Amino acid sequence: ADIYGQGIRPQPPAAGKEAGKYKADRTLLRARANAALDVLARDTRTDASKLAATGYCFGGTAAIELARSGAKVLGVVSFHGGLDSPTPADGKNIKAKVLALHGADDPFVAAKDIAAFKAEMKDHYVDWKFVSYPGAVHSFTHKAAGNDNSKGAAYNADADRDSWYQMEQFLKRLF
């Protein structure tokens, strides 16, 4: 999905600032994600009864927000995405199954946000799974992130392989 809009393709560090606009305005983020979903659902080559959303980093945040919006998707997968919500009561809207794949040592996702996410899922009886990878930090699927965990973002081959496997199994169960 093109959350940012036509012609906007920010690169780090500008990408973080641009994503921050949408993290600060979840209504806008959800609207953009749902607009993309609507385009996909209307495509004649698409079976609109068999939709799922996956995303990495900010895209993972968007996938979870899509679920929180009550979107008609069977499931969402977030790879090292943000888990926080300014409105955890919106968990009541989630109809999708949720798979969150997280680096256990990710410095960009606070422990309180993980706890709140888990509580939100439990409190609203969401069908969910949270997988945490010990020794993995943010961007664990991105080879170009390097291998220096002290920078907060680094590739982790084991977490990358297993998270892909987890997603494959999740999607097989959905479809």
Regions found by a protein language model. Give the residues of each.
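C-terminal catalytic histidine-bearing segment of alpha/beta-hydrolase fold enzymes
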Residues: 122-175
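Gly/Ala-rich beta-loop-alpha elbow adjacent to hydrolase catalytic centers
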Residues: 55-59, 63
